[in-house]
Amino acid sequence: NMTERHSDTCGQRHEHAHGKSKIEEALGKYDSAPSDDSVREAVKKIIAEKVQEKDTPEVKKCLMGSIELTTLKTTDSPESVMAFTERVNEFDNTYPDLPHIATVCVYPCFADVVSETLEVDGVEIACVSGSFPSSQAVIEVKVAETALAIKDGATEIDIVMSVGKFLSGDYESVADEIGELKEVCGDRKMKVILETGCLKTAENIKKASILAMYAGADYIKTSTGKLEPAATPEAAYVMCQAIKEYYDKTGIQIGFKPAGGINSV
């Protein structure tokens, strides 16, 4: 249960034993990340052995039904977002043999536009929040933006992990922020973007993945799409291995979302 897990972790996070915080203790329970070289080799092996096998219409339809159709442009306007959403409404007519996309993703100021325009059942409304894409804002601003997005119709929230704090080793502050924003989201799904291109190493990506899941993420996501490199097969491999290990230890299934720079299958 996500709520139980979250309240448990938040309630214990500042207790210390043997000089270690609860976050450090939690991270210590997981395997060390593989080396960057071994990750590259593992990815090469998967691509060589699995890509052709998985190149089927069924897999492609599954991927189509997992897409988060996104507009996060400086030039977005109520009119452009409305037209963007109408494309989703027309999808069945345009592509009758394909599954619907999963989600429409916009800035919080357009949540109400999508909510009022979207006519398709089963398509979620996601908003990036918490000072996307940099996550450089005080927590009160992040909380307010998230709460307002939900009030205006967001059914999912995408936040960005505080990468600077993470790289400085301030894991407790990073986890506290994620936990506080998950409290605002309640039972709505919250994705935590790790911005793996800034983390650079498999070790950092593994640690950030575990930290985000421990703190309350429902999904972990590679990138904002605003920086390069964005999603890579190597980052995806490390994150998915972390999700599997987390599930093996807790029984809690966390989702994975690759984002940024993906333009083919």
What does each model-found stretch correspond to?
Residues 13, 258-265:
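Short, intrinsically disordered, charge-balanced linker/junction segments flanking boundaries
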